UniProtKB/Swiss-Prot annotation:
The gene is TCF7L1. The lineage of its organism: Eukaryota, Metazoa, Chordata, Craniata, Vertebrata. One of its GO terms (molecular function) is DNA-binding transcription factor activity. A motif (Nuclear localization signal) lies at residues 421-427. Detected in hair follicles and skin keratinocytes, and at lower levels in stomach epithelium. Residues 1-74 are annotated as: CTNNB1-binding. Residues 83-101 have a biased composition (Basic and acidic residues). This is Transcription factor 7-like 1. Residues 346-414 bind DNA. Residues 67-81, 431-441, 478-497 have a biased composition (Low complexity). Keywords: Activator, DNA-binding, Nucleus, Repressor, Transcription, Transcription regulation, Wnt signaling pathway. It is found in: Nucleus.
Length: 588
């Protein structure tokens, strides 16, 4: 670290008695730092520590810590110093508060208990996470180990002798050997430390070339190398993945939470999408298997398989080999057809008549003026039949030789090859035609079903004369119903009913008026039978309601007889006379 000339006396003079000792220490040893480093501490701490009696001892301890830090930084290589000089130095206040507080953290940690900080006004400090429900029995606190969560970088590295100690912790391997005292710089984006990879440097285990390995890549402060640690800001080699301990100091805090507690997922990264930038994730997903990808920070479990939230899901998608088989199966019938077409078509050997036609066709064409092949074939057929047996035998012999030659040239050929192809073509044509017809029919049926409206039976409103339909059926079914209507109420009514019954059944009532008259006659017959048995009693004429439409017009036209008194012997002459006119009307 570059040192300035010690003029500490002037700085301590303005701050009071508490600052005199530290100013003298600064003036006595030049390696304690510049004046501007001590002024904020004296101004801020002096106000609170002046009334207390042990302020001088506390400041003495802080001076010792700072001197050890500065001495250790001076012991680094000359390249580290020169590199640190080239880098723009941040504001001195950003490092003063963590250094001052580090001594307060270190002293109670050595005595195995934690005291309240003497500077409660510092906002960016190490906070003991005593209220987090995820750390009481979680994987980071074996045996009730105390957990300290820090806010953000820059990291202040200390020697391994100043390791955070806790006597109750049985496994010190879970704690880091350096205490990262953190502060959130206001001039940087809050998500800057999470995006740790660049497009240019993806070499496992090697820091950027413009920084030496001895310098912290974030702050520029020289840091002591430790063999058991690897920088979490660079990808790890695949062999070193399983050797990383769980350092508590490297837990990446979540942005926006007041206590910076761990998420319920344990070591899950709070920003899995920001662990690697876009080019890095595409490179990892396309070129590396999941076992070759290093975790984004060493807080992950010590296994070769990274967290699924960090590995891009594109890695898990494997190309499906069965997708090629349908294409092959689709192409197979086409290729078979092409191969069949490529085969040369072997004609069958010529028979005797074909040989004769081949020989005589040119002569017939020369003799005849006809150009049609069908007419020429007919002429050749007539001439073939006109030949004698001897002449035909010559062509039969030629045909036999032709077959022998054909069998020698094509030993595996059979006539089924040619005819089978023709049949296949016919079948395919028929199938295609039937399928096209079926498709046309289905399309027409679908259109018809869409265009058709549901048929609803149209029923006209019933007329009042339709009401006694039940009485019509009962009248025609029972053979003795119209008998009393055609006969007198005397005893020989049975003979008249037998003679007159075919009349009433054969005369088909064509109009509804005639059926209405039949129903009136049936009711009058019932009234006559009841009146002969019981003259004084009320007739059962009104046992069935008589509709007005079914009554004959003569009955409705004579109100004195029927409506005046409802006795049967008064209504009987009118009802008996009406069916006689019905029989005479229906006869002609």
């Amino acid at each position: 670290m570059p040192q300035l000339g010690g003029g500490g006396g002037g700085g301590g003079g303005g701050s009071g008695g508490g600052g005199g000792s530290s100013a003298g220490a600064a003036g006595g040893g030049d390696d304690l730092g510049a004046n501007d480093e001590l002024i904020p501490f004296q101004d801020e701490g002096g106000e609170e520590q002046e009334p207390s009696s042990d302020s001088a001892s506390a400041q003495r301890d802080l001076d010792e810590v700072k001197s050890s830090l500065v001495n250790e930084s001076e012991n680094q290589s000359s390249s580290s110093d020169s590199e640190a000089e080239r880098r723009p130095q941040p504001v001195r206040d950003t490092f003063q508060k963590p250094r001052d507080y580090f001594a307060e953290v270190r002293r109670p940690q050595d005595s195995a208990f934690f005291k309240g900080p003497p500077y409660p006004g510092y906002p960016f400090l190490m906070i003991p996470d005593l209220s987090s429900p995820y750390l009481s029995n979680g994987p980071l606190s074996p045996g009730g180990a105390r957990t300290y969560l820090q806010m953000k970088w820059p990291l202040l590295d200390v020697p391994s002798s100043a390791t955070v100690k806790d006597t109750r912790s049985p496994s010190p391997a879970h704690l880091s050997n350096k205490v990262p005292v953190v502060q959130h710089p206001h001039h940087m984006h809050p998500l800057t430390p999470l995006i740790t990879y660049s497009n240019d440097h993806f070499s496992p285990g090697s820091p950027p070339t413009h920084l030496s390995p001895e310098i912290d890549p974030k702050t520029g402060i020289p840091r002591p190398p430790h063999p058991s640690e690897l920088s979490p800001y660079y990808p790890l080699s695949p062999g070193a993945v399983g050797q990383i301990p769980h350092p508590l100091g490297w837990l990446v805090p979540q942005q926006g939470q007041p206590m910076y507690s761990l998420p319920p997922g344990g070591f899950r990264h709070p920003y899995p999408a920001l662990a690697m930038n876009a080019s890095m994730s595409s490179l990892v997903s396309s070129r590396f298997s999941p076992h070759m990808v290093a975790p984004a920070h060493p807080g992950l479990p010590t296994s070769g398989i990274p967290h699924p939230a960090i590995v891009s899901p594109i890695v898990k998608q494997e190309p499906a080999p069965p997708s090629l088989s349908p294409a092959v199966s689709v192409k197979s019938p086409v290729t078979v057809k092409k191969e069949e077409e490529k085969k040369p078509h072997v004609k069958k050997p010529l028979n005797a008549f074909m040989l004769y036609m081949k020989e005589m066709r040119a002569k017939v064409v020369a003799e005849c003026t006809l150009k049609e092949s069908a007419a020429i074939n007919q002429i050749l057929g007539r001439k073939w039949h006109n030949l004698s047996r001897e002449e035909q035998a010559k062509y039969y012999e030629l045909a036999r030789k032709e077959r022998q030659l054909h069998s020698q040239l094509y030993p595996t050929w059979s006539a089924r090859d040619n005819y089978g192809k023709k049949k296949k073509r016919k079948r395919e044509k028929q199938l295609s035609q039937t399928q096209s017809q079926q498709q046309v029919q289905e399309a027409e049926g679908a259109l018809a079903s869409k265009s058709k409206k549901p048929c609803v039976q149209y029923l006209p409103p019933e007329k009042p004369c339709d009401s006694p339909a039940s009485s019509h059926g009962s009248m025609l079914d029972s053979p003795a119903t119209p008998s009393a209507a055609l006969a007198s109420p005397a005893a020989p009514a049975a003979t008249h009913s037998e003679q007159a019954q075919p009349l009433s059944l054969t005369t088909k009532p064509e109009t509804r008026a005639q059926l209405a008259l039949h129903s009136a006659a049936f009711l009058s017959a019932k009234a006559a039978a009841s009146s002969s048995g019981q003259m004084g009693s009320q007739p059962p004429l009104l046992s069935r309601p008589l509709p007005l439409g079914s009554m004959p017009t003569a009955l409705l036209a004579s109100p004195p007889s029927f409506p005046a008194t409802l006795h049967a012997h008064q209504a009987l002459p009118v009802l008996q006379a009406q069916p006689l006119s019905l029989v005479t009307k229906s006869a002609h």
